[in-house]
């Protein structure tokens, strides 16, 4: 099961008392701010949670798995996430599902 934006909005509705419309809008605005910051090259730091960064990946050789043909993988920018210590501590000791 995955946590969705709808789940976050529902939690805001239940725990904070926002209307469903305001809760949904708050979640949308939150994620839009993160997207805009990353698009403009800024780091996103969420205290107690972690950091989102942009990393440059240079061009590298690749291979088409179906044909075996060598193809270049173009240079690109990727988003990385580094969890903060508090988040790491909360999930570190969770039991491992098999």
From Swiss-Prot:
Biological process annotations from GO: DNA recombination; positive regulation of metabolic process; regulation of DNA-templated transcription; regulation of translation
Q: By its UniProt entry, which SUPFAM superfamilies does this protein fall under?
A: IHF-like DNA-binding proteins
A single GO molecular-function term is:
DNA binding
Q: Which UniProt keywords apply?
A: DNA recombination, DNA-binding, Transcription, Transcription regulation, Translation regulation
A Pfam family assignment: Bac_DNA_binding
Q: Where is this region: Disordered?
A: 53-73
- Gene Ontology, cellular component aspect: cytosol
Q: Where is the composition biased (Basic and acidic residues)?
A: 53-69
Q: Could you describe the subunit structure of this protein?
A: Heterodimer of an alpha and a beta chain.
What protein family is recorded?
Belongs to the bacterial histone-like protein family.
Check the record and name the HAMAP family matching this protein: IHF_alpha (MF_00380)
- Functional description taken from the UniProt entry: This protein is one of the two subunits of integration host factor, a specific DNA-binding protein that functions in genetic recombination as well as in transcriptional and translational control.
Q: What is this protein called?
A: Integration host factor subunit alpha
Which source organism does the UniProt entry give? Aliivibrio salmonicida (strain LFI1238) (Vibrio salmonicida (strain LFI1238))
